[in-house]
């Protein structure tokens, strides 16, 4: 669990969210935070791995709380589960019943990609009584468009996994694009 793994279909979804037990460093390498130079110890105590502070205060070390820790951003009641940055941007998966891990790619929730690509999204992790189409419509209503994230490679990975002829050139484009996460 502490060795990096390649983004293979057995371990990661096509959008590179964690699918199986992997070292979270792999998802971290995909994040905009990593690209900006943020390190593990900016959020975690290097000796205990515990968060340096609690709740949204971790994210507010860099992000403007008046803009992001607000109902106008997260669309949830203040203090509720959906109002926690990590619930939307670092969804948790529990492995073997006792090992909860958050995906550290810190992605923008993309329920539209759940609809088109079949990947999970943070909205439906909590709103289990609704489907991805509902979540995608809710995000579209809030933003006036589909959400856009830092990780844009999912449709290309899906095409590659599906054996589409255009996938090779598109994969080469991702591999040569310095703006893409290096992993």
Placement of each model-derived feature along the sequence:
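Primarily the internal scaffold of c-type cytochrome electron-transfer domains
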Residues: 1-179
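Extended alpha-helical scaffolding segments
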Residues: 181-183
